[in-house]
Amino acid sequence: MTDKQIKIETLLPFGPAILKTSIPSYVVDNLNAHCDETLADEQKLKDYDYSGQLAGNVKKEFKLSGEFLNKEQNFSNILRKLAERMIAVDVRGTEEQLGVSYLRNAPPSTTNIAREYITGCQVLTVWCVSQWGGDFNPLHIHSGDLSGVLYLKVPEGLEEEYKNEDHHPAVGDIEFITGVPQAFSRNSIKVSPKVGDLYVFPAWLHHTAYPFRTKDQERRSISFNIIYNIDQEKLKNEKMLVDKE
């Protein structure tokens, strides 16, 4: 039997999904302009400071204003589309039920949530991470159902730093980690940031951002948390009918 006669199908059904897309440059420019404005204003930095709520060893982390996000509907629409995609059949499989461990805001009295009960999603918080040489984000998770990161600026020196790394290069990378190492299975993936790249992943997925050494250059990103909206009344009524039966 020849190699051509042997048809092999690869199945990789396990593990969390990570969605990736590229954001239009004009959206990146709008977000950068807003971040530049905040970074240049000490009072705004103080008013919108978010570092106390985050795990990062980063000097400047601040929330984006609600007023700006209401105007920047293109970014919000992209996030909503990605949230819809995350629970699509071709990503989550054909099962009708989504586990409560995935939808953290689901009622505690239920064990599973069907897609029909999900009515949309809500972006909870959006913040900017202005990272400089030596700054890093230790291994952590987020709150909500989904989280994500969008890269707005990447130091030009990262590529050269990568070339100089002779052992497991990771400068400036983000790494996603789940489970434990096993034969024939990977439990982590590293991604090098590129301007305009946006990643969305389950909020429970551990991840870390590595430091870099390049001086006087910024690695700027936007992070966010999303929850799914659930029709609690419909779920409650239908559960009561099931219980009575």
For each feature predicted by the language model, list its residue ranges:
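Short beta-strand micro-motifs in enzyme catalytic cores
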Residues: 17, 218-222
